[in-house]
Amino acid sequence: MQILAALFIDDMDMRQVPGPATRIDLTGIQFSGPAPAPMPYTWTPHLCVIVHCPPDQNGFSALTVEFELDGEQVARNVQPLQIEPGKFGRQLVRPEITFERPGTVYAHCSIDGGAPVSVPFTMLAPIGG
């Protein structure tokens, strides 16, 4: 399996279209934002990981996401992947990450220990703070 994309999002919707085919609608894709409350602030984002399973694979793997802040792992999520060979799938990951001050967290996403896809998110200071 391979990761096609990993993004921090506000919401996601899946819908059927003629074909039959499926559409994944992502809204509120983000790479930075102000903390909505004073720091320290605990953030629980939606990380959406889009995955493809080639037709010649069995459709079973494990997705690992390690979240790194200031060079230190602050959260880790491991979940099974089951995607029909030749198809696409999506996984949602919801960590809890506490920011003591503004900074950038990196989500390092990998399948079965393969090369990671890394996605940053920068937490900015609260507006007016």
Give a label for each model feature.
Residues 1-46, 125-129:
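Non-catalytic, glycine-rich low-complexity segments
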Residues 44-46, 84-94:
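Aromatic sugar-binding surface patches on proteins
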Residues 48-54:
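Short edge beta-strand/loop segments characteristic of extracellular beta-sandwich folds
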Residues 57-59, 101-105:
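Short tyrosine-centred short linear motifs in exposed loops/low-complexity segments
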Residues 65-69, 109:
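Conserved aromatic beta-strand anchor motif in extracellular beta-sandwich/beta-rich domains
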Residues 74-85:
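Solvent-exposed serine/threonine-rich low-complexity stretches and specific carbohydrate-binding patches
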Residues 81-82, 122-128:
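Short beta-strand edge segments in extracellular beta-sheet folds
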Residues 112-119:
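Short acidic/polar inter-strand loop motif in beta-rich domains
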